[in-house]
């Protein structure tokens, strides 16, 4: 299946097909002329797929080198970026060459940032290998790295030339790594897609059920992301809906220490906490927090952060990228399948941190 991201200045396709990673070279040959390519990945993904993708690209006429770094959210920083820059220079990459981001969200965010800044921007594509990356982070052009202060604090908007999604690679994920991706899938059902929510309701929550329906879950999620990115590429309006659960979720990730709490886990806890307080304030319908909680728990996602410290979380919130002056744009769900922006002051945001 192809989903067109029809952004006027940089349209591209998301290709979703079981087994398509084996044809990565042919796919890229249709996008780029033969040239130098650097595959940016982490050491874990490299051990599984780097050689396979490298050979496919070489068969299609590309000159290929591989750069891998130690896996983990804690490596998504400017130190790693500098190492990639140095590797690209040594390989002689020019503005006519490109980067293939092969991996999960950490790899995709970092490689995209490198591509968008190296020589003021070179071409790149995404081949996401985690559920979170396949349904969310590989699509839409947000790139970035973390700082000690906040997640994704340094970044750019830079669209890839294409996204290649092979649902079969999810079978090599660990249980926790697969399940955390469901945090984003559940979010899509809540903010935009009641049909997806109904599908999730019908699943039993097992790993087997996720893998069996992975292609459909990915397609639904990508369609929601497509709609919001096309209408609002630079995150000033409807695209903000995608941040449901992320305001508190990112604060949890930052205060826990990057890599301790996975992104989808933090989003799940953020959605539950925001909904609980918003429901108490009459801003979200009665019973919706219970529905969200039960859905997250069914798939094995955490719903409560055990190291909850209001002071530290609030400090992290002050660095939120959605803040404008002393106001945060909080995303709420007034009804299933619909989202809205609710501006709150940073002071009022403290209410949403009360357990």
UniProtKB/Swiss-Prot annotation:
GO terms for molecular function: 3-dehydroquinate synthase activity; metal ion binding; nucleotide binding. The keyword Nucleus does not apply. Catalyzes the conversion of 3-deoxy-D-arabino-heptulosonate 7-phosphate (DAHP) to dehydroquinate (DHQ). InterPro entries: Dehydroquinate_synthase (IPR050071), DHQ_synth_AroB (IPR016037), DHQ_synth_fam (IPR030963), DHQS/DOIS_N (IPR030960), DHQS_C (IPR056179). It comes from the Bacteria. This is 3-dehydroquinate synthase. SUPFAM superfamilies: Dehydroquinate synthase-like. Gene3D superfamilies: 3.40.50.1970, Dehydroquinate synthase-like - alpha domain. Binds 1 divalent metal cation per subunit. Can use either Co(2+) or Zn(2+). Its main location: cytoplasm. NAD(+) binds at residues 71-76, 105-109, 129-130, 142, 151. Keywords: Amino-acid biosynthesis, Aromatic amino acid biosynthesis, Cobalt, Cytoplasm, Lyase, Metal-binding, NAD, Nucleotide-binding, Zinc. It comes from Streptococcus pneumoniae serotype 4 (strain ATCC BAA-334 / TIGR4). GO terms for cellular component: cytoplasm.
């Amino acid at each position: 299946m192809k989903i067109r991201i029809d952004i006027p200045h940089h349209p591209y396709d998301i290709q979703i097909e079981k087994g398509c990673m084996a044809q990565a070279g042919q796919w890229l040959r249709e996008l780029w002329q033969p040239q130098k390519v650097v595959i940016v990945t982490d050491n874990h993904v490299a051990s599984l797929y780097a050689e396979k993708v490298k050979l496919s690209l070489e068969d299609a006429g590309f000159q290929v080198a591989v750069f891998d770094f130690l896996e983990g959210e804690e490596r998504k920083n400017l130190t790693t970026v500098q190492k990639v820059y140095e590797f690209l220079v040594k390989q002689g990459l020019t503005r006519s060459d490109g980067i293939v981001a092969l991996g999960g969200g950490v790899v995709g965010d970092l490689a995209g940032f490198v591509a968008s800044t190296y020589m003021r921007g070179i071409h790149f594509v995404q081949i996401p290998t985690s559920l979170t990356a396949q349904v969310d982070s590989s699509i839409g052009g947000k790139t970035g790295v973390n700082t000690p202060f906040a997640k994704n604090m340094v970044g750019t908007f830079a669209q890839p030339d294409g996204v290649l999604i092979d649902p079969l690679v999810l079978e090599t994920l660990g249980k926790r790594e697969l399940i955390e991706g469901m945090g984003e899938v559940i979010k899509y059902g809540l903010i935009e897609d009641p049909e997806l929510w109904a599908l999730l309701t019908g699943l039993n929550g097992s790993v087997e059920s996720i893998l069996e329906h992975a292609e459909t879950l990915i397609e639904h999620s990508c369609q929601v992301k497509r709609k919001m990115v096309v209408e609002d590429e630079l995150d000033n309006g409807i695209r903000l809906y995608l941040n449901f659960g992320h305001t508190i979720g990112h604060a949890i990730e930052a205060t826990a220490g990057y890599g301790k709490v996975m992104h989808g886990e933090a989003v799940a806890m953020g959605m539950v906490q925001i909904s609980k307080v918003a429901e108490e304030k009459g801003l979200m319908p009665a019973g919706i927090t219970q529905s969200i909680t039960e859905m997250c728990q069914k798939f094995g996602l955490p719903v409560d952060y055990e190291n909850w410290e209001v002071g530290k979380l609030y400090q992290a919130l002050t660095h939120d990228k959605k803040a404008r002056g002393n106001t945060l744009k909080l995303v709420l769900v007034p009804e299933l399948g619909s989202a809205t922006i609710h501006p709150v002051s940073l002071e009022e945001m403290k209410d949403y941190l009360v357990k």
